[in-house]
Every structure is written in structure tokens, then in C-alpha cells.
């Protein structure tokens, strides 16, 4: 993989074994919006990222190289050799063969612990669109404003300190339902 910086954008070329849509939409994270085909707004680590994939190139728009190196490289797990891992799994594990062949481009996102924990609690008996809506509502209501992309406002997932005084009733207003007491306990 080659990395360059062009007019305020980090550009990755010769990217192998990565599919942005598969990675974001497979159900491991919920704090993103699809903007266009293979283009997304992603909220993570108190940052807002517009990212697009074009074949074997990935563009991180309006991103400092330092943010790529300190946040996004690890978040998207670009440093791991997924081709080697897949080759090993295909040779040794028949059970995983179909999954590996079906989801060739999924990377394991290195997410913030607190957001992952709360999202996991929310995910009980929920479909992905509803989980995403609850995460978005919690972020709008209790998180910090991160900015705007294409006329849409985005908010960071709230921190533990931002959630420490949130009540079960507040959480139920965000449509968490029976999960509210578990979220309060987790905070």
C-alpha cells in the first residue's frame, strides 16, 4: 500500500483485501452514514471523516497525515496483512472458507471501547438500522458537535463523563427500551 498527501487529503493506493462498504456495513460499527456508493462519513475517536474507496484506492478527505497515522490507520486496521490471514484460514479451516470468500474485504475496526460496549448493549434484539439510529440519537443528544458534511451535522459518541448523569428515562427517550438500565450500569 502506498500513502500520499494531496491537497489536504490522505490518499492510499494499491490497497489490497479491503472493501470500505463491507467493513462498515457488516455490523461491527454503527456510527457512520453512507453518502454515496463507496463513500461514507465516519465518526470515531471524536473525529469526523469523509472517506471514499475507488477500486484499490482510498481517499480520506480533509485529513491531516498525523490524524491518519494516529487514528485512521489503526481504526481501519490498514497495517495488518489480511491477504496472509485469509490464505491461512482458507488452507486450514473449512468452516471459515465460505465467510472468507464472501466477505473478502472486511477489516476488523479498532474502535473505542466505551462506544463499542454501549453499542453492544444496544444491539440486543435489534436490527442494524435501529441500532444506528439509537447511536446517532445518543450522539446528538449527549455528544459534541463534530461538524457538517453534505449539509448533515455529525456528533461524537458521548464520553463516559458526558453520560455519567444520564438517567434511564433519558435513555428510554432515545429509544433504548429495556436496555436503559444496562447502559446506566455500564457507565
Region spans (language model):
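HhH-family (HhH-GPD) DNA N-glycosylase catalytic core used in base-excision repair
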Residues: 1-187
Amino acid at each position: 500500500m502506498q500513502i500520499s498527501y494531496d491537497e489536504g487529503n490522505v490518499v492510499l493506493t494499491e490497497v489490497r483485501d479491503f472493501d470500505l462498504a463491507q467493513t462498515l456495513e457488516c455490523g461491527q460499527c454503527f456510527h457512520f452514514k453512507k453518502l454515496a456508493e463507496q463513500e461514507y462519513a465516519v465518526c470515531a475517536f471524536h473525529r469526523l471523516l469523509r472517506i471514499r474507496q475507488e477500486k484499490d484506492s482510498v481517499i480520506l478527505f480533509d485529513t491531516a497525515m498525523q490524524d491518519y497515522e494516529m487514528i485512521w490507520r489503526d481504526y481501519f486496521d490498514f497495517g495488518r496483512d489480511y491477504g496472509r490471514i485469509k490464505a491461512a484460514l482458507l488452507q486450514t479451516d473449512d468452516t471459515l472458507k465460505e465467510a472468507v470468500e464472501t466477505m473478502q474485504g472486511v477489516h476488523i475496526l479498532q474502535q473505542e471501547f466505551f462506544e463499542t460496549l454501549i453499542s453492544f448493549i444496544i444491539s440486543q434484539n435489534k436490527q442494524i438500522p435501529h441500532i444506528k439510529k439509537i447511536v446517532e440519537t445518543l450522539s446528538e443528544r449527549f455528544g459534541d458537535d463534530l461538524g457538517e458534511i453534505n449539509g448533515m451535522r455529525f456528533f461524537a459518541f458521548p464520553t463516559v463523563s458526558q453520560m455519567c448523569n444520564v438517567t434511564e428515562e433519558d435513555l428510554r427517550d432515545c429509544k433504548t427500551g429495556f436496555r436503559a438500565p444496562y447502559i446506566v450500569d455500564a457507565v
